[in-house]
Structure formats: structure tokens, C-alpha cells
């Protein structure tokens, strides 16, 4: 413990500019967990005890994996800094409520051991760990990852039904409106969260409030969620309709699927996004465009996870072309 504390307090000599603040990795991670808590609690209310089991399993598996990997690597144990807890929480919030616990545990293991520590650990991973875990589960168990149940709050449980994006993809916009009883009722369900979907992605209002808290604390920049969500809105409005250009429903698409949780809590991951504001805007534009492309033209109803991972892959390239020019030199 003493050795870990000494390493934590070692100063690194480097050129200016220097960041001077009392923020720490631990404080930021636990603040993000706090911002996600209302949406997670609402997900448990919506989907019942199964959702709680998924969340607890995801968190415990992530923390335990972190502990043993750091033990094997002979690294300081950092399970109290909140990073593994956050990865497990984010992953579980992006999963169906009835997914078997062993799949959740495998997803957390992949997120921590492979996506995070195989790259060197916290601060060195190229891809968002939670999304790597989710993508691995989607490839390995596609049926379990696309099987949904009605909300427990509705009084009926364990009845297979589709998500709003699934209805739109398979049956069209008219059937979507018919299912929810009109456009107004659809928007209300999407905004409040009384709809089907992954555990933590249903309530737009709670996720936005959590995101605004992080913006207020200056832990994330507002440009990424605004540009990403706005890009999806514009492109789905222009090309998402069936009767011509600019006949799509942008309001629905901006609240649907995992866009809000992805834009506020995953696309803003400070480790896997570009360093400059210009680069972050390019990142958000690309993620929004890819999400729209997958939703409108792909075989899968949702594209947030894959769009963010693809943009993670080109982040070094974006950084290369958006880094500030040194004084007295040319690009």
C-alpha cells in the first residue's frame, strides 16, 4: 500500500502547459457513476429483479477481473478508483434485462482484461472497454442480445416484444405509431423511459440530466453529445422517411436506442477520443453519421456501439491532423 501511494505521488517533469486542479481519476469515475445512477435505478424499476442481477453481476465481474489482472501483472491494485466499477455499470446498462448472468460476466471480463489491460491499463486503451464487451457479446450470443421482455412496471413480465427501433426496422414507422398510440405517446414514452430497450438506455430525461451534471462539473465537453445527437437528427430527418427527402422523424431517432447514453457517457470517454475540441467535433460527426447509416441501411436496428468503436479506431489519425501548430512552424 505504501509503495502504491509513493508511486501515486511521484511528480513528472514536463513542459507547459500544466493542469492545476484538485480533480483525480477516482473523483471523476465515481462522479460519472453517480450521474448514471438515476437511469440505472429507473431501469431496475422498469424491468425488475433481473435487471438488478445484470447490473450487480456486471459490476462485480469487472471489479474482480481488475483485481486479478493487476495481481498477475504485479501492478498496484486500483479497484477503489471507480474505473472498473464504471465499466461494469456501463456495460450492464447497455444489455437486455433478461440476459443470463454468465454472459454478463464474460462481457465484463472481455472489457477489463482484453479491451483495457491488454492495451496497458487505464489511460492506454484504444477502444471504449464497455463497448468492446458489448460488441463481443453481440457477436457471440446475438439471440440473447436481441431478445426483449415487456416492462415489469406494466404488470406483465417475460413476454417477448421488440424495441422501438426494432419495430421501425422490421415493420415500419406506421406500425411504430400504432404500437404506441400516436406520435405524442411515442415521444412521451421515449422521453420518460416507459419503453423497451436495454436496462439503462430507456429514459432520455434521466440520461440527459446525468450528462448535464458532467458538463457542469467540466468532466466532459458539451460539443460531443450535442454534435453526435444533432448529426443523427439531421441525417435521419433527411433520409429516414419513406415518402421522400426530409420526411423522417428526427425527434424519435435522437431519443431512440443507446444514442443518448452513448453520446453523453461513452463517446466522451477522455481516453479514447481526440484531444482537441476540433478533433472531438470531427469524432462526434463521424459517430453520428455512422449511427445513422447503420440504423437506416444496415441489417441491425442500432449502430451506436459500432459507430463509437469505429471512431475510436481513427482517433489517432484525427489527433494527427487536428493538433495545434507549434509557434513558429508550419503544419
Curated annotation (Swiss-Prot):
The chain crosses the membrane at residues 23-43, 44-64, 84-106, 196-216, 226-246, 251-271, 273-293. Its main location: membrane. It is found in: Cell membrane. It comes from the Bacteria. Its EC number is 7.1.1.-. Part of a membrane-bound complex that couples electron transfer with translocation of ions across the membrane. Couples electron transfer from reduced ferredoxin to NAD(+) with translocation of H(+) out of the cell. Essential for energy conservation during autotrophic growth. Contributes to ATP synthesis during heterotrophic growth. Belongs to the NqrB/RnfD family. This is Proton-translocating ferredoxin:NAD(+) oxidoreductase complex subunit D.
